[in-house]
Every structure is written in structure tokens, then in C-alpha cells.
Amino acid sequence: IVPVNPLVAREGGQILGEAAYASVTDAAAALAAQGQKIDMVDCFRKSEDIPPLADEAVAIGAQCLWLQLGVFNEAAGLRAEAAGLQVIQNRCVKIEHARLFGGLGWMGVNTRVISAKRLRQLPY
């Protein structure tokens, strides 16, 4: 996981101990110098901010463009798909991982229907 945040990067800062980059392109270049590449671009941005990020994801050769809950941009998604990227919109990576591999119950989330509320009574 490589953080991209222009405001933090401008000050030479870090996020969770990792150097922050000003753009996806900058992050990809830094990783390429270490023999690594970005496979997935996971966007926590407003929907209207997605088109340039999708273009960067295509340009760096990412395999997947993932837009988090509440984030979707049909035009950018179609462009990325046309370039060969897998595009997921309006989904949370953590929730999907837990749904596929187990673990939703650890957070108090109903495993059949995702809800932020705990049940008032346990079903057993």
C-alpha cells in the first residue's frame, strides 16, 4: 500500500510510516526504481476527482481501478475498462475481502446484509 496525498507529499510527510506521493505517477516511478509496480489504484476521493486518477492508473499499467464506497464515475470507469483495467466502483476493499474470505462478523456486521448497526438481540 502506497499513500498518494498531494498535501502530505508537499511537506515531505508520511502516512502510517510510509512516504506519501503527490500523484499516482510519482508513486509508480518511485516503486519502479525499486523494481516494484502498482497493481491496484484504490481511490478515496470525490467522484468528480476520478477521471485524472483513472487516466494515471491506465498510464502506469495498473491492473485494477477500485473506487471506494460512495465513489463512482461511469465515464472514467468505461475509459479504464477500455484500456484493459478491471474496474470496481462503490465498493470497500476491506468489506469485500471479509465477505469473500470471512471476518465480517468480527466487526459486528451482519454477514448476510452489510449494516453498520448491531442487532439488538443475538440470533441464537
Please tell me what each predicted stretch does.
Residues 69-96, 103:
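Rossmann-fold NAD(P)-binding glycine/threonine-rich loop
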Residues 41-42, 66:
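N-terminal Rossmann-like NAD(P) cofactor-binding module of classical short-chain dehydrogenase/reductase
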Residues 1-13:
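NAD(P)-binding Rossmann-fold cofactor-contacting core
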Residues 14-36, 42-51:
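Glycine-rich, highly charged phosphate/nucleotide-binding loops
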Residues 96-124:
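A charged, well-structured terminal subsegment
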Residues 37-38, 62:
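Local beta-strand N-terminus motif with an aromatic residue
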Residues 49-68:
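Rossmann-fold NAD(P) dinucleotide-binding segment
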